Amino acid sequence: WAFTFTFQPTMEVFMKKVLMLLAAVSLLSWSVSPCSAKESKDLAKTYSQWLPKYEYKLKDAIEVKGRQGIASDGEFYYVSNSKALYKYDKTGKLIASNENPFEGYAIPSNHIGDIDVFNGEIFVSAENFMDGVGKDIQIAIHDAKTLKFKRTFKFEPSSGQEEVSGICVDRDKRTVWMCSWVGENSGRYLYEYSLDTGKYLRKVHLFPVPQWVQGVFYYKGALYVTADDGEADFDEPDHIYRINVSDGTSAMVTLEKSLTEVKKQGEIEGLCVDPKTDEMLVLYNRGARIILGMGKGFYPGYDHEIHEVYRYRMTELKLK
């Protein structure tokens, strides 16, 4: 294919074309020799793991008060701010709020990241965070009705995790996953705990490693992470990646989506899938300049940061 000087494809479009071309070349080479149905199916399966799993069509966006995480139980949306929890109906009406969420915590915290909701409980990734450095990580559980604190999971320092930016529940394996925004070793892994016992199980090395991971969510056998890897100053989009985790010590990372439809490029945060509608929900911030995870003024035309939940219809893609 050819590119003109006036067209610059996004990373997502470029990777799709490259991988589809590779798949076509490989399939063509296989076609000159006998190929069983099983071999063809195995080949398609191999290439499908390099490509996005779904096509995403933007439905709409609703403004919310929180800037960190989004979760849904199918009836409500739960949104986290750095120091607050909010509950919305699906029209965007605020139902409840808890602006003192750390009350009852054994270890003081000042920051909540991405969240999840499961069986009437909100799973909160909490810590002390300042200028790109996190400490005192906690896995806190809040009541989904009242948003009040209930209990904590024990964090395992020997895991090597130095910061927590998001948390999710694997409904199939009954485990809890956490991600880290901080780079170097901590940000190269996802960390798994038992949902039933709270015991730390393992960490999984990501290949390649996404930059500045903000949120994580489990959906139909895969983990999805958001990465604040686009440079807002240059109008670059952030991205969503898919991770097919197995029992191994490492997992391949696939580009799932580029966030090109947002009103203005800024900072991607948490994500989830509404279990009733199968719509992907992505929290995105715009207007504020973010340096090392902290707000440092505003872009021209803004005097405050705007937080929005983008809702996407998902259609599974099939490699024929």
Q: Where does each model-flagged region fall?
A:
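Repeated scaffold domains used in trafficking and secretory/extracellular systems
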Residues: 64-71, 106-116, 158-169, 209-217, ...
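Loop/turn-rich, solvent-exposed surfaces of beta-rich toroidal or solenoidal domains
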Residues: 208-249
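Blade-loop segments of beta-propeller domains
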Residues: 94-129
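A short beta-strand motif characteristic of beta-propeller blades
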Residues: 52-62, 94-106, 148-157, 199-206, ...
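A short helix->beta-strand "capping" segment at the edge of beta-propeller domains
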Residues: 39-65
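Beta-strand-rich domains and repeat architectures in extracellular enzymes and scaffolds
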Residues: 56-83, 111
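Structural motif
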Residues: 85-88, 131-140, 185-192, 232-243, ...
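Short loop/turn segments immediately following the C-termini of beta-strands
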Residues: 82, 127-129, 181-183, 228-231, ...
